[in-house]
Amino acid sequence: MDTLMRITDHLTTSPGIQLKIDKRWGASVTFVTRSIAHVRIFDAADPQLDRTWSISLGSNATPRTGLGPRDLLDHSPAPAWAGNSRDVAPVEDMEVTTTVTASAEDTASHPEFSGVYADEPVDSPDPDEKSFIVGTDSLRVIIRDCPLRMTWQRRADDWVTASEDRPTGAYEIGTHTGRVAHHRVRNIDDRYYGLGEKSGDLERTGRIFDMRCLDALGYDAGSTDPLYKHVPFLMTRTANGAFGIFYDNLSASRFNLGAEVDNYHRPFTSWQADHGDIDYWVMTADHLCDLTPQILRLTGNPAFLPRWALGYSGSTMHYTDAPDASCQLLKFIDLLREHAIPCDSFQLSSGYTTIGSRRYVFTWDRDKFSQPTDTTRHFRDAGLHLAANIKPALLTTHPYYRDVAEAGIFVTNSRTGEPATSMFWGGHGGNVDFINPRGVQWWKDNVRHQLIDMGIESTWNDNNEYELWSEDAICDGFGHPVELDRIRPVQALLMSRASFEAQREAAPVERPFLISRSGPLGLQRYVQTWSGDNSTSWRTLKYNTRMGVGMSMSGLVNFGHDVGGFAGTARPGPELFARWVANGVMHPRFTIHSWHNDGSVNEPWMYPEITDIVREMIRLRYRLIPFLYTLSYLAAERREPIVNPVFSLDDTLHEESDDFLLGHDLLVASVVEKGQTTRTVTLPHVSDGWFEFDTGVHHDPGTVTLEAPLDRLPLLVRAGAGIPQCELPAPSGEIITTRTVENSPHRIVLYLPDGNGHSQGFFFDDDGHTNGYRQGHGYWLTWSADHTDTTVIVHTHVEGDYQPSWGTMAFALRPGDERAIKVVADAAQD
């Protein structure tokens, strides 16, 4: 590849600067906000891909600071189906200044141009070297050439360097291969995070990661790479704060985060992609976790899913693969009642589509389901929702294959004009092209007629990695053909969007719930996701937990894992399953799923000796749904992740941990090691320490050891917090669902420190399934508590016109707190 060297022309613009490099390459730096900038480097005569599907930064996508109905985000419109222009205009009023320095001598007079290393291994200064300072009052870039390189600085007390390109060559383009690369300096204290769904530890330093989407059945959560999703968002913790870089390139790529060394270069990191242009976004912050709201602002707010999405969702391949699939499914409802297991939905695996031994999307196996609507009605009558598995490929033996091929709906072989086929679930098949209006419409029609009309209200978008590796595979591109290799993850994104729109068109008032396994950043605008087909082991439990925190930090905030492990030789033993359920109930998505070699099934009641434990863990989740629902609202409307690393509260806790936070108030200390009955936890340094959730016992920040028998999940509440909960009815023959939660008494349990103090908090509720809250039909409650040694006085303030069926919010004190409590309701506001 060729290294980009000299700036041969430039033009200053109001939001940045445009450059000509080596008389051939175009480059631009555009500041879209005070703290987010966009860099493009491309062939000026022939940009490789002039569209983006990931960026969703509208003119009204400004942050909000309040918590009331007037503080809702003005959501940005989704990118056009055909993609948006990569030239994004600023969305904030700001001044961008440019300083031009024409020579190396002048450059030397500016101390802010000094690199990280005083002895940079470059040739003697070129008298014609050009340099520029471009930026806002918060973020700026220093651009130099010979070779082309950039240094990013953020304003702290003074300007400090956040990231520096490699001075011995930063940008490379393969004029024959089409590959591109970007190299940056790696400082000794830099630590790397992000990249979405990745195996191993939360910190990525010292590893190499592939960014490709694969169907990684039974992967090792500690080491397998790549996995299912395309999230090229790298977060760096530096001595001068946090730096984020998002590569808006959808081809297969590779990150070297310090695994490579080269005598001719200082320590460096690299990003390299097979195709496309060098197109990236930079952002800075004081702390690592402050980057997450910024990447969400850039790529789109998380969908606000219906309340029932927080309930337990049953699933297994076994039921729908069985010859008596309908009976197996109906038996599941009976077993929920028999064992008093709360539940809200069931995910229908693809066995409902079989004809013989093969699976054909958008068909029903009438031997298993003579009347599909009879089965779906039983679930609806039980208060349970159904989500059906759908896959974006049709085997060549599919009854619709010929018609779909003739309609030009598949990804095409550019040489033959025929469908480009690939291996897919027991045969070769064609892949639906969602960058094609005919493919989108065909998909939406079939979701409506084959699923929704049959009583299925949600879709489970699966096996959408598009492992079609022919270099001749080409997509319609909405009239502008584009090679699949350049945009592969977009297919999963637009598949999810097509399913989303089909569901919304069928039920315009409802907030759609759907799931997708694969896709790029931007996926969070439509779906919930999960970590794919994991395997049954203690190792998976441990590393899926870390994987999930990494996904959340990277912007995929609504996620979960297959509890019990999807793949493996057999189901988990009782101890592992109990610990996995305890871990799973504390994630945004809680699903028990399986497809084991021995035909066994992961079910809540599969071990009678621990069924009571499993039931109580699931009931604990349902008690906490008011808390989880508030966190879901804050994710959608404040871009606050539901799951956070413990170092989001304490910058000294960057060592690897099996703990995580729900919001910023509840610390989850899962047991992930076999045979453990105690759990050692390092508590973040916060004012007044922490309380055990169930006992009210207080702990100062620092390391503590907690009792963790099999029936106990150690949970700790930040002192001063209030945890919204509901009071569930006793177990009975009726299935507890989130509708039960909506009709059960609510209370906020205050975990206040002893003595004098002041605390405050927030709670949100609405009807749980529509967007009426955006017109004020919600319940926004803020509370403040003033406390002494003997009394607690709580002031509440409610906005919105929603009248919850659970009545008036009650307040209670943590276990062991005997102070008198008084609640004073302030006058409501319209």
Spans of features found by a protein language model:
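N-terminal accessory segment at the very beginning of proteins
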Residues: 1-308, 315-317, 324-334, 348, ...
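Aromatic- and carboxylate-enriched substrate-binding clefts and catalytic-loop regions
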Residues: 54, 155, 342-614, 650, ...
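Short, well-ordered loop/turn elements at secondary-structure boundaries
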Residues: 127-129, 135-137, 227-230, 236-242, ...
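Internal mixed beta-strand/loop scaffold within catalytic domains of large alpha/beta enzymes
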Residues: 161-162, 216-236, 533-558, 566, ...
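Short, hydrophobic/amphipathic alpha-helical packing segments
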Residues: 210-213, 227-230, 329-330, 440, ...
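Conserved, mostly hydrophobic/aromatic
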Residues: 233, 336, 379, 499, ...
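N-terminal small/glycine-rich loop or linker at the start of catalytic domains
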Residues: 305-317, 420-431
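Catalytic core of carbohydrate-active enzymes
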Residues: 501-502, 519-529, 551-561, 568-792, ...
